[in-house]
Amino acid sequence: MQFLEFAQVCEHLEGTPGRLDMIEQVAAVLPRLDDEELPVFVRFVMGRVFPDWSTKKLGVGPNLLYDAVAYVVGTKRETVREAINTTGDVGLAVEGLLARKEQTSFFIQELDLLDVYRELERMAAAEGQRSQREKLRVAQGLFGNARPLEGRYLARLLLEELRIGMGEGNVRDAVAKAFELDVRLVEHAHQALNDLGEVALLARRDPDALSGVTIEPFRPVKMMLAQAGTIAAQIEDHGEVAVEYKYDGSRFQFHKVGDVCRIYSRRLEDVTESLPDIANLLLEATDHDVILDGEAVAVRDGKPMPFQYVIRRFRRKHEVDSMMEKIELVPMVFDILYLDGETLMDRPLAERRKALDEVLGAHVAPQFPATDAAAAEAIYAEALDLGHEGVMVKVLDSPYTPGVRGRLWVKVKPGVETLDLVVVGAEWGEGRRAGTFGSFLLAVQDQGRLLPVGKVATGITDEVLAELYALFKDRVIARSGKEVTLEPEVVFEVGYSEIQTSPNYESGYALRFPRFVRVREDKSVDETETLDSLAERYGRQRNGQGSL
């Protein structure tokens, strides 16, 4: 497949309003691709270059992209930036700039889908002091051979933000339709492999094998997620439940085979070198080959410390030993996904818990059975007294469903409801906040698109505001007056008093009295609130269901 064909598919998808029509279009393309092209196309059309579990990262920021395009077009970086500010879209701006170049130059080489992928692999492999120079050289070569339409989607792909509405759910359904398979079978394989590109290839080569796909050590899967809910509703719906403390820590996944172990964050990053104490504790705690799910909790004098202490340990590459002395982390393991060559994800929680107790023992988080709301609320009160966030209320026969935010697991916390939202823009401040960002535009995800739900300015101290400016200043993609568009990479936890319907935002909803709680450095965009889950929260709110 030529990259131009891929760009044309994306252009058609971008102009298609209906979800089913989009699925039809992608499903029609998939069978025409060869075995090498198929997984690459599937990832690309979702705006991704590598599988979620892969440690490969492009490492391309807006400035590198601006420099590459400026070089190819024969202009200055500021001209590229101005074009992006005018259009509000990196892809459209690059397309326009390349259209001017096209009138005065000849193409050197046709871009092929696989050639683009191999060049992006080369970009990701660049390391050391000269890595940025090598990445720039690769980007210049790609844009130098790109037609304007190709440039639109190449620019977005480099920033891994395609904006055409093909999220995982749509692509999963397209794979099922293309190869005439039950979508549940495709979803099962996707949960285990964590790569729809590989799933698509397997669906064509050996569809019968999809049902037998299992998770593998050292290939992290997405973590099962919880919805906000109530103790009373969970017990009313399911009878006996398992109640666990909700820790103010950071999720991790521990993989072990023999004497080799790795730890992955909830963003699926390898953080083993940052957490040698956690690795050693769990390595010594079991002789079995396992994949465990748990939470790293900071403690001082036996009492839990806030999340901010935990995150200072994650992804730290320097002075790890000195930071270990300052901040003690303990693992609280609450689930087991894999044991001695066998996946346990499809087994009920009660069985998984029994296996966990048998193979680990130490460092297992306490779990309490409850059959009535009074007993569960007593555990909830105890959790708060101990300094924890609240409780998790889990259905005992629930399977482990990677990446799914469902009601089989419910989180219960006191006070204001919170949402994890993607920061997609900001507005320059005034008065005391002049010279920095004063408010931030927040969005929910919906099948590859990010839809705004409001702005937050309240709850941000001057000190935090300075930290946020440092965090975002190099993530600015476009400017328009006082407003800027940001790379959608950072997640805010935001409190609110009410969800309202609103014509002012593309999502159709707005938050009443939004308040900044914290940056969720441990969370990826894929783990943020979806439009569907926001609508469900709105429905529960209208029905008068609270958070306790």
Swiss-Prot record:
Gene Ontology annotations of biological process type? cell division; DNA biosynthetic process; DNA recombination; DNA repair; lagging strand elongation
Q: What class of enzyme is it?
A: ligase
Reactions this protein catalyses = ATP + (deoxyribonucleotide)n-3'-hydroxyl + 5'-phospho-(deoxyribonucleotide)m = (deoxyribonucleotide)n+m + AMP + diphosphate
The record, for InterPro entries, names: ATP-dep_DNA_ligase, DNA_ligae_ATP-dep_bac/arc, DNA_ligase_ATP-dep, DNA_ligase_ATP-dep_C, DNA_ligase_ATP-dep_cent, DNA_ligase_ATP-dep_CS, DNA_ligase_ATP-dep_N, DNA_ligase_N_sf
Please name the Pfam families in this protein's record: DNA_ligase_A_C, DNA_ligase_A_M, DNA_ligase_A_N
Q: Provide the cofactor list for this protein.
A: Mg(2+)
Identify the residues that bind ATP: 244, 251, 266, 295, 334, 405, 411
Q: Between which residues do disulfide bridges form?
A: none
Cross-referenced CDD domains: Adenylation_DNA_ligase_Arch_LigB (cd07901), OBF_DNA_ligase_Arch_LigB (cd07972)
- What is annotated as the active site? 246 (n6-amp-lysine intermediate)
Q: Which UniProt keywords apply?
A: ATP-binding, Cell cycle, Cell division, DNA damage, DNA recombination, DNA repair, DNA replication, Ligase, Magnesium, Metal-binding, Nucleotide-binding
Identify the domain of life.
Archaea
Could you say which EC number(s) this protein's record lists?
6.5.1.1
GO MF entry, a single one: ATP binding
SUPFAM superfamilies registered for this protein in UniProt = ATP-dependent DNA ligase DNA-binding domain (SSF117018), DNA ligase/mRNA capping enzyme, catalytic domain (SSF56091), Nucleic acid-binding proteins (SSF50249)
Could you say which protein family the record assigns here? Belongs to the ATP-dependent DNA ligase family.
| Function, in words | DNA ligase that seals nicks in double-stranded DNA during DNA replication, DNA recombination and DNA repair.
Protein name in UniProt: DNA ligase
Q: Which gene encodes it?
A: lig
